[in-house]
């Protein structure tokens, strides 16, 4: 068997030498080398691949150590006389934890709607939260008259027109029980984001608004 293989190899070499077929295709050689390397890597015997992996791990370790050094050093320089600490990396002032604690929360209330998504009143107790005394201090005379004639409807207008506080600051204020500005227009509320349910809520709000401000009330 060995003699036969040797004979075939010898004949092949002689043939290649006589026909110039020993000029191999570079693409074929490259493909062959890739196949050999892939098989060596699969068996774990490729030294070049192991070397690359080791170098990659070392680079990762060095980067982690450098990042830890930057964090541990404080990365800040105090500007003389200003009391501020500037980051040496970003150049942005660093806020102390004490300053963060001193920050006051948002004063503007986050309203909880008194209507459900269909425009129906959730609770009468919430409707009474805006008392007549508070209303009398802030409301113009015309709205006070409306309140005297129809307190429930007036409060619905004040607290429920913008049911979900969806568009703009004064709409949120309206849901929180504050009086709307004189230019308030229920038709201009951002209802489109609610889809079909928004149409129902808008119709409900507009009907309340019309009932409250109707002449002769």
Swiss-Prot record:
Disulfide bonds: none
Signal peptide: 1-21
Alphabetized UniProt keyword annotations: Nucleus, Secreted, Signal
GO biological process, one term: collagen and cuticulin-based cuticle development
Subcellular location: Nucleus; Secreted
Traits of the deletion mutant: RNAi-mediated knockdown causes dumpy body shape. Defects in cuticle integrity.
Residues forming coiled coils: none
Superkingdom as given in the UniProt entry: Eukaryota
GO CC annotation: extracellular region; nucleus
Nucleus in keyword set: yes
Function: Probably acts downstream of the Wnt signaling pathway.
Protein name: Protein dao-4
């Amino acid at each position: 068997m060995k003699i036969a293989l040797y004979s075939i190899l010898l004949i092949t070499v002689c043939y290649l030498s006589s026909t110039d077929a020993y000029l191999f295709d570079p693409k074929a050689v490259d493909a062959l080398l890739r196949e050999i390397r892939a098989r060596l890597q699969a068996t774990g015997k490729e030294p070049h691949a192991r070397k690359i992996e080791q170098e990659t791990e070392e680079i990762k370790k060095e980067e982690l150590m450098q990042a830890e050094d930057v964090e541990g050093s404080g990365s800040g320089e105090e500007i003389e006389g200003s009391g501020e600490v500037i980051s040496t990396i970003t150049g942005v002032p660093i806020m102390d934890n004490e300053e963060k604690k001193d920050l006051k929360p948002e004063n503007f209330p986050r309203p909880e709607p008194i209507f459900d998504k269909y425009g129906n009143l959730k609770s009468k107790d919430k409707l009474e939260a805006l008392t007549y005394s508070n209303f009398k201090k802030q409301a113009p005379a015309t709205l006070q008259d409306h309140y005297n004639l129809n307190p429930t409807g007036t409060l619905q207008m004040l607290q429920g027109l913008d049911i979900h506080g969806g568009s703009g600051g004064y709409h949120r204020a309206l849901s929180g029980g504050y009086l709307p500005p004189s230019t308030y227009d229920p038709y201009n509320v951002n209802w489109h984001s609610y889809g079909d349910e928004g149409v129902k809520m808008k119709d409900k709000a507009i009907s309340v608004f019309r009932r409250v401000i109707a002449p002769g009330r």
